[in-house]
């Protein structure tokens, strides 16, 4: 499992912290110009604007996975995202291409909620004690080790953008799905496909307990008890209060939100879906968005002819995504020029082989 404390070997030199924003921007741009097409900088939508301005492409997890796989020209990928995204890029790209993460402490709390030891134990209990024929699926927000586990057992990765297609595929395999590590995306997707809540269970990896209310024989999906630390901060009460103030308000949320929030919202979908919905919204319409704050603020700045706010007025940005900043980006690019490999993310060959199977299966389904 990724351990940000063990992964960080050196503190950022003080000189980068002392540089002005203009100096950092000029330094970064100069290196981009120098390296040209040898450098590629995929950047997640949740990044802040100071980083997004240098992106060669912005996207959600599915878009970035596809783009990295298709790019055979770049020698260096500087991934402005979090650790599991850089791992995914390494798995999908050629061995001759290096993947850099500007700050090695940019992890993901959701991915850390399912380590491989827990997954193997949970699988054994579900298959041996409860006699369930399990097909595992994992959200791409997971470690390479979890993706390997899923690939070895014939399963697939999913993203919020293709979860419905992949879960539908899995349901048609005649097995019980084990959905890692985000219970909310799994529950919302399965329910949207017509699976009632009583045919869902939750596996608690800490208590080592299977929680269900219906008949065990009717189970269609077991949800890993994990969640996104950002999207869990949106609640149905936020929607209720907003509609009391403004009955005409439009509410759109990410499916990583709790089931009650998704059911109460007017719209729910992936990051790409949210962006496209806001882009095509009628002028003068009013929107509350339940997703990461950097993206909400960027949409608010971009589409000024509609009213946009966060569903939770006290919301903050994703803390680990925000670890990627101009000083770390400049430092990382200097390391590339110096031949320093400290920030390279490399997945071992055996893990990458089976993890790639789960990723390729996802891409073939969708």
UniProtKB/Swiss-Prot annotation:
Keywords: 4Fe-4S, Cytoplasm, Iron, Iron-sulfur, Metal-binding, Pyridine nucleotide biosynthesis, Transferase
Annotated binding of [4Fe-4S] cluster, by residue: 108, 228, 318
Compartment annotation: Cytoplasm
GO CC annotation: cytosol
Metabolic or biological pathway, per its Swiss-Prot or TrEMBL entry: Cofactor biosynthesis; NAD(+) biosynthesis; quinolinate from iminoaspartate: step 1/1
InterPro entries in the cross-refs: NadA (IPR003473), NadA_sf (IPR036094), Quinolinate_synth_A_type3 (IPR023515)
Gene Ontology BP terms: 'de novo' NAD biosynthetic process from L-aspartate
Pfam families: NadA
Annotated EC: 2.5.1.72
Cofactor note: Binds 1 [4Fe-4S] cluster per subunit.
Cofactor: [4Fe-4S] cluster
Residues in coiled coil: none
Molecular function via GO: 4 iron, 4 sulfur cluster binding; metal ion binding; quinolinate synthetase A activity
Chain sites annotated for binding iminosuccinate: 44, 61, 139-141, 160, 254-256, 271
Source domain of life: Bacteria
Catalytic reactions of this protein: iminosuccinate + dihydroxyacetone phosphate = quinolinate + phosphate + 2 H2O + H(+)
Known role: Catalyzes the condensation of iminoaspartate with dihydroxyacetone phosphate to form quinolinate.
Assigned protein family: Belongs to the quinolinate synthase family. Type 3 subfamily.
PANTHER family, per database record: QUINOLINATE SYNTHASE, CHLOROPLASTIC, QUINOLINATE SYNTHETASE A
Name of the protein in question: Quinolinate synthase
Natural source organism: Staphylococcus carnosus (strain TM300)
Classification of source organism: Bacteria, Bacillati, Bacillota, Bacilli, Bacillales
Gene giving rise to this polypeptide: nadA
């Amino acid at each position: 499992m990724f351990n940000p404390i063990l992964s960080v070997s050196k503190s950022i030199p003080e000189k980068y912290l002392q540089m002005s924003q203009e100096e950092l921007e000029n330094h970064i741009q100069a290196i981009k110009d120098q390296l040209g097409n040898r450098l590629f900088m995929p950047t997640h939508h949740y990044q802040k604007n100071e980083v997004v301005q240098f992106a060669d492409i912005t996207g959600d997890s599915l878009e970035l996975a596809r783009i990295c796989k298709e790019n055979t020209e770049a020698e260096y990928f500087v991934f402005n995202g979090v650790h599991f995204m850089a791992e995914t890029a390494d798995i999908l790209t050629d061995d001759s291409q290096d993947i850099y993460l500007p700050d090695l402490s940019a992890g993901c709390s959701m991915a850390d909620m399912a380590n491989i030891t827990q997954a193997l134990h949970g699988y054994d209990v579900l298959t041996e004690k409860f006699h369930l024929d399990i097909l595992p699926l994992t959200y791409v927000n997971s470690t390479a080790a979890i993706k390997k586990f899923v690939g070895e057992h014939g399963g697939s990765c999913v993203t919020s953008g293709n979860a419905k297609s992949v879960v539908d595929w899995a349901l048609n395999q005649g097995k019980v799905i084990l959905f890692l590590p985000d219970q909310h995306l799994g529950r919302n997707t399965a329910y949207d496909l017509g699976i009632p809540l009583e045919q869902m269970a939750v596996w608690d990896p800490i208590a080592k307990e299977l929680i269900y209310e219906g008949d065990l024989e009717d189970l269609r999906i077991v949800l890993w008890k994990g969640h996104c630390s950002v999207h869990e901060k949106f609640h149905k009460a936020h929607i209720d209060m907003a509609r009391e103030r403004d009955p005409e308000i439009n509410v759109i949320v990410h499916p990583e939100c709790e089931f009650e929030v998704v059911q109460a919202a007017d719209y729910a979908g992936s990051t790409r879906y949210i962006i496209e919905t806001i882009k095509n919204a009628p002028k003068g319409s009013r929107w509350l968005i339940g997703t990461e704050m950097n993206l909400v603020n960027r949409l608010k700045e971009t589409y000024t002819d509609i009213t946009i706010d966060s569903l939770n007025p006290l919301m903050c940005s994703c803390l680990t995504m925000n670890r990627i900043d101009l000083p770390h980006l400049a430092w990382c690019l200097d390391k590339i020029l110096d031949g320093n490999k400290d920030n390279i993310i490399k997945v071992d060959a055996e893990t990458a082989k089976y993890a790639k199977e789960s990723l390729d299966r996802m891409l073939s389904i969708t």
